[in-house]
């Protein structure tokens, strides 16, 4: 296919045009007084959002060369979202500012490769400054502040702080759509997996249709149970003690299942059977998780363990087990804290090593089940459109709080960028020529988030930037209430990881755009000539 090629200034200008179209669409959402963007959907109602990456993903431009610029900046947003989960609008805005200032200098004759060196030096200094200025998250209040700023709503901040407190930092917090108007939090303590009882005859509470076992033994095996003789020795031992039993096995059917149900109906003893969760190797790993959590062993022939010879000491124990039609919850397992901690560390290592998103998600689920439980935030709203918008904000806020716990918090509202300007400015003494120009470009770009937040609030950005520059470190502008305050004291904070990632990713892509000398794209194919109206198709008019 024939290609169209643009060179030099013309190529860079086309890319810049695309960058500006995408960035101008996204940056109106920044800050407490930022607006929303409406995205058209082929099916269903339009999506209204202020999430940078969601907007960026929808932008596709008609001009091939301009579209390349837009796609490059889209990468800034998606990469920042992948690393930090928030800060996508800031990253896009920074990329635009660096490209804009850089283009002016390249057009004036600056060497892009030397400029790039200056950009990188300045960013490394700025990132070091951001890390130095950050402070650790101290308790629930800080988490609530981060989430409130990210979601732009206090209720959401409080909900997320409650959820993080209940399930710890390693716990899983999921966001679901609620059937009601309100937004609320539901916490499942202990380990939950998606397998329920094998027979409705096993329930102990017929009103709720669930089986509740207090202080039961737990038999964990990867075998398929059909013969009751395999189970008899251990069952007799449990009946003697007057205890209840939960069996987790690959499957239970035939004589084994019938005998268990009959004994339950006769009142001899209470036993509930469920299938093992997961499939293949993941099933083995999950059974091992359950065994460690409950202080038992997985009875498997792979380890030379025979079901007939199972001892009572090989069974797990828990304070309570609740078995529903489709879920089983093990509360307060009897496993040793040391073993559980060691297992958690092992899963964390696997999460770091895996390259598959699916595997990472499944490993994080296992980690959550072992470490604290699962919290579900149920999002409710008057209309579906509002619910989707709210859900996106909550997901962003969740990612921001996790990032804050990881690397700490810095002053929000763009103040963290201005606070590192003095450090970056010191580089002007040790650099010269185009490298020095690269440092100056970053110095200008660091002001951009504050300018944009102010402009979105209908104020003059330059005045506010100068005022913050001459104020003490940590002092910033509260755009919601239009006053200068100590940002951290006032609860306006951003995660250091989000701030750092936004800057690093913006420079990475901006440097690529500035060092571009030619752009190649497919030539648009000429449209086929339209068939004149009124002509008969084929020989249709003849007899």
Curated annotation (Swiss-Prot):
Keywords (A to Z) from UniProt: ATP-binding, Chaperone, Cytoplasm, Isomerase, Nucleotide-binding
Protein name: Chaperonin GroEL
Gene Ontology CC, one term: cytoplasm
EC nos: 5.6.1.7
Domain of life: Bacteria
PANTHER family: 60 KDA HEAT SHOCK PROTEIN, MITOCHONDRIAL
Subcellular localization: Cytoplasm
Family membership: Belongs to the chaperonin (HSP60) family.
MF terms (GO), sorted A to Z: ATP binding; ATP-dependent protein folding chaperone; isomerase activity; unfolded protein binding
Function: Together with its co-chaperonin GroES, plays an essential role in assisting protein folding. The GroEL-GroES system forms a nano-cage that allows encapsulation of the non-native substrate proteins and provides a physical environment optimized to promote and accelerate protein folding.
Keyword flag rRNA processing: no
Catalytically driven reaction(s): ATP + H2O + a folded polypeptide = ADP + phosphate + an unfolded polypeptide
Keyword check for Methyltransferase: no
Subunit structure: Forms a cylinder of 14 subunits composed of two heptameric rings stacked back-to-back. Interacts with the co-chaperonin GroES.
GO biological process: protein refolding
A Pfam short name: Cpn60_TCP1
Region (Disordered), start-end ranges: 524-543
Chain ranges passing through the membrane: none
């Amino acid at each position: 296919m024939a290609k169209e090629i643009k060179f030099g200034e013309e190529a860079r200008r086309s890319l810049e045009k695309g960058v500006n179209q995408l960035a101008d669409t996204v940056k109106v959402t920044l800050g407490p007084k930022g607006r929303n963007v409406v995205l058209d959907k082929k099916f269903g109602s339009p999506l209204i959002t202020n999430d940078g990456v969601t907007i960026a993903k929808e932008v596709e431009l008609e001009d091939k060369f301009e579209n390349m610029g837009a796609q490059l900046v889209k990468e800034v947003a998606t990469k920042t979202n992948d690393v930090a989960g928030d800060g996508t609008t800031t990253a896009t805005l920074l990329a635009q500012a660096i490209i804009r200032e850089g283009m002016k200098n390249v057009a004036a004759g600056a060497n892009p490769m030397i400029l790039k060196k200056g950009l990188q030096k300045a960013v490394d200094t700025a990132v070091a400054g951001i890390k130095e200025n950050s402070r650790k998250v101290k308790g629930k209040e800080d988490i609530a502040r981060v989430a409130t700023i990210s979601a732009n709503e206090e209720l959401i901040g409080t909900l997320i702080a409650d959820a993080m407190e209940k399930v710890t930092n390693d716990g899983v917090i999921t966001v679901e759509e609620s059937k009601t108007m309100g937004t609320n939090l539901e916490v499942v303590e202990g380990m939950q997996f998606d397998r329920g009882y094998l027979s409705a005859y096993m329930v102990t509470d017929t009103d709720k249709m669930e089986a509740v076992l207090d202080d039961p033994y737990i038999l964990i095996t990867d075998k398929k149970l059909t013969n009751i003789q395999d189970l008899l020795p251990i069952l007799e031992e449990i009946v003697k003690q007057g205890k209840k039993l939960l069996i987790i096995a690959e499957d239970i059917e035939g004589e084994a299942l019938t005998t268990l149900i009959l004994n339950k109906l006769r009142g001899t003893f209470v036993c509930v059977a469920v299938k093992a969760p997961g499939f293949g190797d993941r099933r083995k790993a999950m059974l091992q998780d359950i065994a460690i959590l409950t202080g038992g062993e997985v009875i498997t022939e792979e380890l030379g363990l025979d079901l007939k010879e199972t001892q009572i000491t090989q069974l797990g124990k828990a304070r309570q087990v609740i078995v529903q039609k489709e879920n089983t919850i093990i509360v307060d397992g009897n496993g040793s804290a040391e073993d559980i901690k060691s297992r958690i560390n092992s899963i964390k290592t696997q999460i770091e090593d895996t390259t598959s998103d699916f595997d990472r998600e499944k490993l994080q689920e296992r980690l959550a089940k072992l470490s604290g439980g699962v919290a579900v935030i149920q999002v409710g709203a008057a209309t579906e459109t509002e619910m989707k918008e709210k859900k996106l904000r909550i997901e962003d806020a969740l990612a921001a709080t996790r990032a804050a716990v990881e690397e700490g918090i810095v002053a929000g509202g763009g103040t963290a960028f201005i606070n590192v300007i003095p450090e970056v400015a010191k580089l002007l003494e040790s650099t010269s020529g185009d490298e020095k120009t690269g440092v100056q470009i970053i110095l200008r770009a660091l002001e951009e988030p504050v300018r944009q937040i102010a402009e979105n609030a209908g104020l003059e950005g330059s005045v506010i930037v100068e005022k913050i520059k001459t104020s003490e470190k940590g002092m910033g502008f509260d755009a919601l209430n239009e006053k200068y305050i100590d940002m951290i004291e006032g609860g306006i904070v951003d995660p250091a990881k989000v701030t750092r990632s936004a800057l690093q990713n913006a420079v990475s892509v901006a440097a690529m755009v500035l060092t571009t000398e030619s752009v190649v794209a497919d030539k648009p194919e000429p449209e086929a000539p339209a068939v004149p109206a009124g002509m008969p198709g084929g020989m249709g008019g003849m007899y």
